[in-house]
């Protein structure tokens, strides 16, 4: 039987989607009206999603709350949290749900056929038959609820989405983004934040929430996607029988209307919060925003991505450089959102002054006029096109299955035209057209039409305001206090009872009967053998090469690693700056603009970074490398190596103006990253009180690095030559042949072809004096807190089990899954209201527990301290134990692209990890029993007794817990 024989479906279109090596089908389910798009191919990492068009009508976050709550139990699978049960007990390669401005999507992926079928069933039942209509507690837990524990206690608001969005709205970037869409689309859905504004989330009623669900969650409003190597006919028959045939077509009014263009540009101002003692100088965000066409235009869809690179994102791009030269902003960047009906292109200057708003706009317009008049740099256009095409062809999306990204790409057009899910995947022809257009005035005309003559635009200014967060907290506290005061004794009693009832609901586990309704694999379904390493040693001109014989589709992945273990701690801040600056300064043969363009024309990217590796065999030995990575088509290898050699051996650090621009840019981006990734920053900072690995992470990427960048910025203004000299000294010290190690990922033929080119580049490096001994370090304070302007916290507690005499075993990987999806999930997220909580036990002994967007502080630390008690009483039945084992294998066996396989092998080589050790740990996981987990209670207790904590977050919360800390300071 073929798809053509399925009477339940109408085939609207079928054709070969050659650019993604798939057979494409567009179907309509006749009875329900459901839309189905299929990409059938030989990829065993299968992907499914169901999406719904969900245009928000207000700022209460109802689409976001529904996304959270549909996955909290359903008719067929009535467990309280099937999402977590699947995370614990499936071999998924992706499992999540996402709320977009105009749609909500529920994707899953797996390489295991039965697992894939199970995931589809659970997700489809979740969206069509959720328990949200039966249990208001689900809405309260995930959305929002009043919390009152006693009649004399303070009335509060809690809820997972509520706290998530409090964290989001603490970020000026989030404030800017929401305000841009509000300014450009006042009359359609894009002016409303689908995630929810914390000020308005508590205005959402249970009834309005259910009405939104019933309105939009119907097959007639659905978009169903299947990708990969599967029996498509069987899946479609099952889909019809189990779900779609139960529904008749229903007219769903989910149409998104276009916003009519404006007669003139709109000017909007708003504010974001900084702490009371922060300076307001140079803290304003300025943006120049234009609506550009619609998302169904294949050429525009790609062309403005190229213009983003050519005009503002590439080093020395004309708009960026003009603004930087005028002293407007520390960081200037472009933004292009093509995933909505009317795409938006923006220029943004971060850390400017509000008084510069008019100048900001005039500089952009004058620069664009000059570009139109004289022509865009053709090399920049080609670089932008080649970069986009390389990324598309490589289809490397890190941990995400490429089929998922292809599917989400489909929705950029499919949502607005039922016949066009694949138009942005069939883009190689578009790239060819764009390449030809470089020699015409096509791009200049786009600038004139959409960026200069277009009145559908806005200028949004986001200013800092001291204590705005505190003002809002105080206003909310007063509002809640007044509300409580207006209540009768009976109403207060009801609030207390509701709070207690919700806690009891949260504490009551799902019944064993309900848990057994969830489909599950067995231990026998797990792959017995670990993925092998591929490390073959070779030597070229006395330089060791570790090659990884892996098929890489004609792309060479090469890393040059330089021993940096003898760099003093005082040099690490400069090394971090050096890492960020390399490739962005001019060289002997290239200006920094030409270098960036050539890199993107001839390679898939040249990147620099540092890599820290513990030596498993010798705990006192620490492998610290400076790493230069490049990816390149075999035919362009010589050019790629020439560009890399220029970067490493002839970078010019005497242009202190350029160094100043880079320092300001790094500082601005760190300010955003320290808050947005506060959980990881806090964990590393906490571990830096005892771990060399974490200390280096902090010095090169974290809080210590931010402090170093601030000092370097000051030094550049006072003694610029000293900074230039230090960077030049780092290059001279670091880039020596005797420090070099090369990693090569590609097949044997590719390596043999590359050897002459590698030898040629090696010969260009001098041999220097011997590498010195590992540097001494001074660890940070064990108990620290860092204050920012957010309304939530990131709470970390860390320790080291190897220092306490314990050994790493595979059971620790299992424990991580158990804690993440059971104890921590229930206590920190479900009961505590935090958006997330995670834990890790590294092979080198470092361990952490950390929360994400957490309304609590000391309560979360108490939860961590009770972990050993939980482990001691851990007594699951065989089914639950198997579930945890399957979830652990899911993380172990995530599919990898060639580059990731090479990196995994190289890490094992540097750390001294043998395949036998990995296999032993795998066996320990596969054969684990509850007593193996209980034995880890003392290990975890030893970790927690280290009592190393770090909190990043709200000033008032930190001050209330000041006794916990030895050091409290501002984050930024």
What are these regions (language model features)?
Residues 1-47:
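Non-catalytic terminal extensions that flank enzyme cores
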Residues 40-42, 49-51, 162, 166-171, ...:
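His/Glu-based metal-binding/catalytic segments typifying zinc-dependent metallopeptidases
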Residues 45-55, 81-129, 136-147, 174-199, ...:
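M16 family metallopeptidases and their MPP-like homologs
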Residues 62, 66-70, 578:
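Active-site His/Glu-centered metal-binding helix of metallohydrolases
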Residues 72-73, 196, 200-222:
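A conserved hydrophobic secondary-structure block that centers on an alpha-helix together
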Residues 94, 210-214, 273-276, 319, ...:
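Generic recognition of flexible, low-complexity loop/linker segments
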Residues 158, 210-242, 723-758:
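Non-catalytic, conformational "gating/processing" segments within enzyme and secreted inhibitor domains
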Residues 432, 445-533, 671, 680, ...:
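Long, compositionally biased intrinsically disordered regions
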